A protein has these predicted regions:
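A structural signal for short loop-to-beta-strand junctions that line the ligand-binding cleft
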Residues: 4-5, 67-76, 100
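Extracytoplasmic small-molecule ligand-binding "clamshell" domains
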Residues: 13-17, 26-58
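Beta->alpha turn/N-cap motifs
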Residues: 39-41, 50-63, 127-128, 144-151
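A local structural motif
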Residues: 26-36, 117-130, 266-271
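Bilobed "Venus flytrap"/periplasmic-binding protein-like clamshell domains
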Residues: 2-23, 83-141, 148, 251, ...
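Secondary-structure end/capping motifs
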Residues: 189-259
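Pocket-lining segment of extracytoplasmic ligand-binding domains
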Residues: 129-219
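Hydrophobic/proline-rich hinge and linker segments of small-molecule sensing/allosteric domains
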Residues: 71-93, 169-186
Length: 276
């Protein structure tokens, strides 16, 4: 049995996907799994330092890692929706470059998308959970909101832009790639990576078939949100592309990173995917 360190976030959608694995509903006979639970920006940094065998990261952060394959399962794609830029008072697009904008991490895909849209801006990095309060208190002019706050805060603030909708429009309908899971080629054999990918897919499929059971488990990570809101959030980001991204997911990941390279925001050598 192979021991693996598995990084994922304390977020409801990740909890939903890993529910069957974490509770033994889907048995892992090949792997002894050590769960490492951190926020996404911490996982991004740990992946860059190559500290974990398998981990969730932002698509943006993939351009900074080495020797990791992208798993086909477990990715988060927005289907004409995504991270939202909120403000307390209406903001015009031309004002954004001179505004102070709270961001949930420099390596998050949300930050990359905003840079693609408006270019350089005055970003103030903070934990994603602190951003709504920073907007309310006027500590920042606007805030880039991810996770379930995209939904829960939608009536409290002005929506400057929904970056998933913007991406959908400018790409002719592509899903917006936000989070992926990657596996180390240094510490794991290719066959082990493929086997884990299959196992992860089974865990996601189990959750989708046993929605209420998996949601009940996910509520431990709901941060005070209602079950109805978490259900809605999970259904948004655990979709058919999460089960297997397919060629559509591969293309959208490649397109986002290529756009980042074209605008000199990032650079990368190659994008490596796990075999189907």
């Amino acid at each position: 049995m192979t021991h693996i360190t598995l990084g994922h976030t304390p977020d409801a959608d990740d909890a939903f996907m890993f529910f069957a694995l974490a509770t033994g509903k889907v048995a892992s006979r090949m792997f002894e799994i050590e769960h490492v639970i951190e926020d996404i920006e911490t996982l991004n940094t740990r992946a860059i330092n190559h500290e974990l065998d398998i981990t969730a990261i932002s698509v943006h952060a993939y351009s900074y890692v080495k020797d990791y394959l992208i798993l086909r399962s477990g990715a988060s794609f927005g289907l004409n929706y995504g991270p939202r830029l909120y403000s307390k008072k209406p903001l015009q697009s031309q004002e954004l470059s001179n505004s102070i904008i709270a961001i949930p991490g420099k390596l998050t895909s949300a930050t990359l998308l905003l840079k693609l849209l408006i270019g350089n801006f005055h970003g103030r990095e903070m934990n994603f959970s602190s951003i709504p309060k920073a907007i309310s208190s006027n500590s920042v002019d606007a805030g880039l909101v991810i996770h379930e706050a995209q939904i829960s805060e939608s009536t409290q603030f002005h929506t400057v832009v929904d970056l998933g909708k913007w991406w959908h429009n400018v790409t002719g309908g592509m899903p917006v790639p936000l989070g992926i899971n990657i596996a180390s080629r240094r510490s794991l054999k290719i066959e082990e990576i493929r086997n884990f990918d299959i196992l992860f897919r089974k865990s996601i499929e189990y959750g989708l078939k046993h929605m209420d059971e998996a949601l009940e488990y996910s509520m431990k990570y709901a941060r005070g949100s209602s079950k109805d809101l978490i259900r809605r959030f999970v259904k948004m980001y655990v979709n058919e592309l999460t089960v297997d991204m397919g060629s559509q997911g591969e293309r959208s990941i490649g397109h986002l990173l290529e756009k980042g390279r074209e605008q000199n925001i990032l650079s990368f050598d190659e994008i490596l995917f796990s075999s189907p």
